[in-house]
Amino acid sequence: MMERQQIKQIFGIVCVVEDLKEATENWRTMVEFDSGSVRTGKSAENVKHIYRGKEIMCRYKYMDFDMGGVRVRLIEPENKSGGDPYSDALSKRGPGFHHLMVYPENREELIERYDEEGIKPSLIEESGEDVYLIYDFEQDTGLCVALHDEITGPCARV
């Protein structure tokens, strides 16, 4: 019998926003964060996205910053009409929290356990050898989680 797997660390929080520039200014007003940690960009073109079993285009702009040792990422989807996880979240709930970036004790065992229980990722992102899986537990827990095999961002420096 497989041992119960635990999330070892939450190292990132992803929020979806309508307007990245406006949301950035709101965050700058609300909280103090290291302005030297700010990184902006666009989703990579070479990433394959499989959302709810279907390959999709998922383009977005983002801003990352370090807040108390945790990476916060604000995402503005380019497509606002639905069909990808970020625009669907905006349509359903409006701007706000989307998912946690987590580092489990044993990612492969946890994925295997989810698979045995019939739990499939809602989003698979493949970029070269990197594969990120986002599981949608919103109905049960109110959140989605992205399982990572390493810690990135400010937590990786600790």
Label the predicted regions.
Residues 3-4, 53, 90-91:
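Short consensus segments that form the blades of beta-propeller domains
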Residues 1-6, 10-18, 62-71, 73-76, 87-106, 136, ...:
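Vicinal oxygen chelate
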